[in-house]
Amino acid sequence: MFSHVTIGSNDVGKAKPFYDALLQPLGLVRHMDYPNAVGYGPADGRPQLWILNPIDKQAASVGNGITIGLEAPDRSAVDAAYKAALAAGGKDEGAPGLRAHYHPNYYGAYLRDLDGNKICVVCHRKP
């Protein structure tokens, strides 16, 4: 559905290690790396998630009501990504667990990145 998603950061240099840690358990790698932007995607693909300083040179700000949902291949990847993100400085917004009010197999975790952007890591598959 989406070509790409961008997440604004006020310090891309600090954001890179955070997103490296978060995305590695999901099988996503850096495809492009610039001083003010970094692009991630599947190893055999192209960058689809960009972390960057806003193009308009204004400060990055958090969108109220916005969550970026990243799909994990299995529940252990949700757990690993959540743990890695917290170890890299992320803030807990909901530990990994089943959230059957979304659907019976929704296993997800919620956190905030170093700039305060809300991220969800979720697996929709049966265990």
Give the location of each predicted region.
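A structural feature recognizing the 12-helix transmembrane core of secondary solute carriers
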Residues: 29, 37-40, 61, 69-71, ...
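Long, continuous compositionally biased terminal/linker segments
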Residues: 41-80
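A short beta-strand motif that forms the metal-chelation/ATP-contact edge
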Residues: 42, 48-50, 108-111, 120
